[in-house]
A protein has these predicted regions:
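N-terminal Rossmann NAD(P)H-binding glycine-rich loop of SDR-like oxidoreductase domains
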Residues: 36-49
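Catalytic loop of short-chain dehydrogenase/reductase
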Residues: 100-104, 108-124, 144-192
Length: 254
């Protein structure tokens, strides 16, 4: 099914070209959408696109700094963020756009000789444990009827079946763990809210600070990546819950 798009125009100076907006007609009108990791390249673009859609009463962005701040590695902070969101209305769509490929000068491992316990623990804390805590505190707050979704941004390199190159031990393993956590949560969610969806999404190569040092090509702009992802989100329904999909909506091997 093709993305449902309408043209909108940014009236700000220097941004006169029309841009395409995903309408998200599969969601009930109103309620809330939220992006966790809202200040990153993809997160910021997703927040803007969700606002442009006009589908939701409010679009909230959570990040490490700002008015709606939270700490992904602190469960009390995660729980408070989820409670704050729930008090604002029905939660219809949450996108987890958090993630870490590497920190500082410590680049992704090319060999088992570079595996380090602290770096592995940090990768799992950000890429798997933090999102698991968000799932724990957000999924019980989704409406029991009507389409609602939590979508976690994963990565194709987290696919075990698609791994032909090796390397990147911490990032690959932590994203694979995220995929399993999403799948488990989706099974439990279906018992509580049969129309709800919980999925992992691969955004493709996007031109952000995270991918810049490693991408063979420049990647797509965050605005374009956001449009692709929201198009997939609009098309997915309860029968797709628990899956892992790329930016085209194609299933990615586990």
């Amino acid at each position: 099914m093709a993305d449902q798009l309408t043209a909108s125009r940014d009236g700000a100076a220097g941004h006169d070209a029309p841009r395409l907006t995903v309408r998200l007609d599969s969601f009930p009108h109103g309620g809330l959408a939220a992006v966790f990791g809202a200040t990153g390249g993809i997160g910021a673009a997703l927040g803007a696109a969700l606002t442009d859609s006009g589908r939701f009463d409010r679009v909230l962005g959570f990040s490490r700094c700002g008015d709606l701040s939270f700490d992904l590695t602190d469960e009390a902070s995660v729980a408070t963020a989820a409670e704050t969101l729930a008090t604002c209305g029905d939660i219809r769509l949450v996108i987890l756009a958090t993630g870490m490929l590497h920190e500082g000068t410590a680049l992704p491992e090319k060999s088992w000789r570079e595996v380090d316990a602290e770096r592995l623990a940090r990768a799992f804390a950000i890429n798997a444990i933090g999102p698991a805590l968000l799932l724990k505190h957000l999924l019980p707050r989704l409406p029991r009827t009507g389409k609602a979704m939590v979508a976690a941004l994963s990565a194709r390199v987290g696919s075990i079946g698609d791994n032909r190159l090796g390397g990147w031990y911490g990032y690959r393993a932590s994203k694979a763990a995220l995929n399993q956590l999403v799948h488990c949560a989706a099974i439990e969610l279906a018992r509580r809210a049969p129309e709800a969806v919980c999925v992992a999404l691969h955004p493709g190569t996007v031109a952000t600070r995270l991918s810049a040092p490693f991408a063979a090509t420049s990647g797509v702009a965050p605005v374009e990546a956001a449009r692709h992802l929201l198009g997939v989100i609009d098309r997915l329904d309860a029968k797709d819950s628990g899956g892992f999909y790329d930016w085209r909506g194609t299933p990615v091997p586990w």
